[in-house]
Every structure is written in C-alpha cells, then in structure tokens.
C-alpha cells in the first residue's frame, strides 16, 4: 500500500511540474521586462488555437517562459511565427 501511495504521489508531482515549464503568452508591456531569446515558427495548423498550441509547444521546448505571436497566415493550413522570451 505504501508503494502505491508513493507512486501516486510521484505521478501527481510530475504532472504539476510540467505546468511550470510551459511557455505562456505575453503582452507587449510584459515583453519589455523580458529577454528575447529567439523566434519559433509552426505550420500545418487547421485552427488558430491549434497554431497557438504549436507555437507554445515550440517555445517551451526552446526553454522560453513566454512568447508573443507576430504573424499568422492562411494558405489552406495556418502557419505563424512568435518571438520567444525568457
């Protein structure tokens, strides 16, 4: 029983820690207080929400804590870019 409780606790804590590393959208005023660390791009999204999710995922993978979407275009599938910040 103790092993099960330990495993459940470890799973719960690991789930919570993933949220800490997620990149969040930032406003222009918030971005002024952050360091720009690059730009990410994504394509092939069918909705704006899906495009934002792809850009957020790439920003997090690059170690960013925030991102600001700078472009979105539609040519059958959506593509876009975002500046990433730390």
Curated annotation (Swiss-Prot):
GO biological process, one term: DNA damage response
Signal peptide: 1-22
Record SUPFAM superfamilies: YdgH-like
Coarse class of the protein's main subcellular location: periplasm
Localization in the cell: Periplasm
InterPro entries tied to this protein: BhsA/McbA_stress_biofilm_assoc, Dodecin-like, YdgH-like_sf, YdgH/BhsA/McbA-like_dom
Keywords: Periplasm, Signal
Gene3D superfamilies: Flavin-binding protein dodecin
GO cellular component, one term: periplasmic space
Family as reported in the entry's similarity comment: Belongs to the BhsA/McbA family.
The protein's name: Uncharacterized protein YbiJ
Organism name: Escherichia coli (strain K12)
The encoding gene: ybiJ
């Amino acid at each position: 029983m103790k092993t099960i409780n330990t495993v459940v606790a470890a799973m719960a804590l690991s789930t919570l820690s993933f949220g800490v590393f997620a990149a969040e959208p930032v406003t222009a005023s918030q971005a002024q207080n952050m360091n720009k660390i690059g730009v990410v791009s994504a394509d092939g999204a069918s909705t704006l929400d899906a495009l934002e999710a792809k850009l957020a995922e790439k920003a997090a993978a690059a170690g960013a804590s925030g991102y600001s979407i700078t472009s979105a275009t539609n040519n059958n599938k959506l593509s876009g870019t975002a500046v990433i910040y730390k």
